[in-house]
From Swiss-Prot:
Keywords: Carbohydrate metabolism, Disulfide bond, Glycosidase, Hydrolase, Polysaccharide degradation, Pyrrolidone carboxylic acid, Secreted, Signal, Xylan degradation. Residues 20-25 form a propeptide. One of its GO terms (cellular component) is extracellular region. It catalyses: Endohydrolysis of (1->4)-beta-D-xylosidic linkages in xylans. Its EC number is 3.2.1.8. This is Endo-1,4-beta-xylanase. Belongs to the glycosyl hydrolase 10 (cellulase F) family. The lineage of its organism: Eukaryota, Fungi, Dikarya, Ascomycota, Pezizomycotina. Residues 55-326 form the GH10 domain. InterPro entries: GH10 (IPR044846), GH10_AS (IPR031158), GH10_dom (IPR001000), Glycoside_hydrolase_SF (IPR017853). The keyword Signal applies.
Length: 327
């Protein structure tokens, strides 16, 4: 059905003059444009220099169908500051330049995270030194892309499954206050960027991790910590899409201005699951956008579970068509 519909659409719209030529197998109007028509900011995906150059179909699909890009790895600490005070931006510059030249919003990912953290950072046990290093890292990375990045994941994956704060290196050395320091540093560097806390397994309203995050965010926001949004990664197992609506509504009650689905992929990529997630964002006024964590299955970190909207041949799946029709 997808191939038949795509072929018909290709004939129907072959004569149209479009600013961004689309792949003939895709919908005539991008799913991003359809999503924005409902008042949302973007329906995006991820990219980096390797994946953008690996297969020519990847940038073509991004240009045709997605309105936002998140760097998969090139803005993480190990990529941007592998040695203390020695910054490297070649990978992140490539992604930002591609996004800007093609009119895509950018979500910066990620500034403070316990993983992909260089050993030199993990070897710092003096509180004052680690605070200075963290602030310098945030300031240097954000300053380079000031005015170019719509939103930043300032802190990433800082909660345990029981809703308590993860005992990361930053937590163990600085204490909970590292969260406030990180957000206040980020706000000072780029007052116009949206500042997010991002985490996974926030997919059920009653799950302890979600309720713990909401309670902490309420406390931080009330104390003046400049958290603008909550990002729910939304890496789902098959059949889990139905619970996302309730989860987003719960996250929206934490007191931030925005929520977003930041790393969406769904095992099996069923049409029902994907449409449920898209509708969950559509129906929550604070949900500004969705980022799918990859274009096609071969480039997914969960490739064996076929979780994305495009298959191993970079052709759209039934879930892609279902989203286009639902919008």
């Amino acid at each position: 059905m997808v191939q038949i519909k795509a072929a018909a659409l290709a004939v129907l719209f072959a004569s149209n003059v479009l600013a961004n030529p689309i792949e003939p197998r895709q919908a005539s109007v991008s799913i991003d444009a359809k999503f924005k028509a409902h008042g949302k900011k973007y329906l995006g995906t991820i990219g980096d220099q390797y994946t953008l150059n690996k297969n020519a179909k990847t940038p073509a699909i991004i240009k045709a169908d997605f309105g936002q890009l998140t760097p998969e790895n090139s803005m993480k600490w190990d990529a941007t500051e592998p040695n203390r005070g020695q910054f490297s931006f070649s990978g992140s510059d490539y992604l930002v330049n591609f996004a800007q030249s093609n009119g895509k919003l950018i979500r910066g990912h990620t500034l403070v995270w316990h993983s992909q953290l260089p050993s030199w950072v993990q070897s710092i046990y003096d509180k004052g030194t680690l605070i200075q290093v963290m602030q310098n890292h945030i300031a240097t990375v954000m300053q380079r892309y000031k005015g170019k990045v719509y939103a930043w994941d300032v802190v990433n994956e800082i909660f345990n499954e029981d809703g308590s704060l993860r005992q990361s290196h930053f937590y163990n050395v600085i204490g909970e206050d590292y969260v406030r320091i990180a957000f206040e540093t980020a706000r000072a560097v780029d007052p116009n960027a949206k500042l997010y806390i991002n985490d996974y397994n926030l997919d059920s309203a009653s799950y302890p991790k979600l309720t713990g995050l909401v309670n902490h965010v309420k406390k931080w926001v009330a104390a003046g910590v400049p958290i603008d949004g909550i990002g729910s990664q939304t890496h789902l197992s098959a059949g889990a899409g139905a619970a996302v609506s309730g989860a987003l509504n719960a996250l929206a009650g934490a007191g931030t201005k925005e929520v977003a689905i930041t790393e969406l992929d769904i095992a099996g990529a069923s049409s029902t699951d994907y449409v449920n997630v898209v509708k969950a964002c559509l129906n929550q006024p604070k949900c500004v956008g969705i980022t799918v964590w990859g274009v096609a299955d071969p480039d997914s970190w969960r490739s064996s579970s076929s979780p994305l909207l495009f298959d191993s041949n970079y052709n759209p799946k039934a879930a892609y068509t279902a989203i286009a029709n639902a919008l």
